[in-house]
């Protein structure tokens, strides 16, 4: 069987616009800048979180995505600090309005005991490759979803978001 080769042809201005969306995605997560994140996402997203214990949503409305990401039990918790560090990427053109980005990612997480951010409660870092989906909406590239593939985790990654919740 002959493997189909990906279409690697992108116009340079599209490449630069996609790189900016990628940077804004990661940095808005880390800065908890929900307005910036909202400005770069498509009206609907494909979110495949099966590898991290959740489910797949094929047509998640933008506001549902924003609510999930910014929730106090997820990235919205002020005691959870992150850095989504991007490694190498390659880009697959699906059509003039759709691109899949393949990105190496290290997501460092630290959970603090309280909002003073003085004492680290635990840390957990994820190492993954992500498929990011990009869609051109009204002539502008938007983030349209993701599918992480976890390679390995460090420390107590599985406890990061549970640990941020008050003990019962």
Swiss-Prot record:
Q: What is its main location?
A: other
Keyword line: Conidiation, Endosome, Lyase, Sporulation
Keyword Heme attributed = no
Reaction(s) catalysed by this chain, per the record, are: scytalone = 1,3,8-trihydroxynaphthalene + H2O
Q: Kindly tell me the pathway this chain contributes to.
A: Pigment biosynthesis; melanin biosynthesis
Origin species: Aspergillus fumigatus (strain ATCC MYA-4609 / CBS 101355 / FGSC A1100 / Af293)
- Active site positions, chain numbering: 84, 109
Instruction: Give the E.C. number(s).
Output: 4.2.1.94
What family does the entry list? Answer: Belongs to the scytalone dehydratase family.
Class of this enzyme: lyase
Tell me the residue numbers annotated for binding substrate.
29, 49, 130
| Stated regulation of activity | Fenoxanil inhibits arp1 scytalone dehydratase activity.
Q: Where in the cell is it found?
A: Endosome
InterPro entries listed in its UniProt record: NTF2-like_dom_sf, Scytalone_dehydratase, Scytalone_dh
An example GO BP is:
melanin biosynthetic process
Q: Which GO terms describe its cellular component?
A: endosome
What residue ranges carry the coiled-coil annotation?
none
This protein's name: Scytalone dehydratase arp1
Specify whether Lyase is a keyword of the entry: yes
Summarize the protein's role. Scytalone dehydratase; part of the gene cluster that mediates the biosynthesis of dihydroxynaphthalene (DHN)-melanin, a bluish-green pigment and a structural component of the conidial wall. The first step of the pathway is the production of the heptaketide naphtopyrone YWA1 by the polyketide synthase alb1 though condensation of acetyl-CoA with malonyl-CoA. The naphtopyrone YWA1 is then converted to the pentaketide 1,3,6,8-tetrahydroxynaphthalene (1,3,6,8-THN) by the heptaketide hydrolyase ayg1 though chain-length shortening.
Q: What happens when the gene is disrupted?
A: Impairs the production of dihydroxynaphthalene (DHN)-melanin and results in reddish-pink conidial phenotype. Up-regulates complement component C3 deposition on conidial surfaces. Causes enhanced insect mortality compared to the parent strain in a wax moth Galleria mellonella infection model, probably through exacerbated immune response of the wax moth.
Note the superkingdom of the native organism. Eukaryota
- Give the quaternary structure: Homotrimer. Each subunit contains an active site, located in the central part of the hydrophobic core of the monomer, which functions independently.
Any GO MF annotation of the entry: scytalone dehydratase activity
């Amino acid at each position: 069987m002959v493997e189909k080769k990906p279409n690697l042809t992108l116009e340079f201005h599209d490449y630069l616009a996609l790189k900016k969306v990628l940077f804004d995605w990661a940095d808005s997560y880390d800065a908890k800048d929900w307005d910036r994140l909202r400005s770069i996402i498509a009206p609907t997203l494909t979110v495949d979180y099966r590898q991290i214990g959740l489910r797949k949503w094929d047509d998640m409305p933008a506001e549902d995505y924003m609510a999930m990401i910014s929730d106090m039990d997820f990235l919205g918790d002020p005691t959870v600090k992150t850095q989504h560090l991007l490694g190498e990427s390659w880009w697959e053109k699906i059509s003039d309005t759709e691109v899949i980005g393949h990105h190496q990612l290290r997501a460092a997480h630290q959970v603090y005991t309280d909002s003073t951010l003085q004492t680290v409660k635990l840390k957990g870092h994820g190492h993954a490759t992500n498929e990011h989906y990009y869609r051109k909406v009204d002539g502008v590239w938007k983030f349209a979803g993701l599918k992480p593939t976890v390679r390995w985790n460090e420390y107590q990654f599985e406890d990061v978001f549970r640990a941020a919740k008050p003990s019962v």
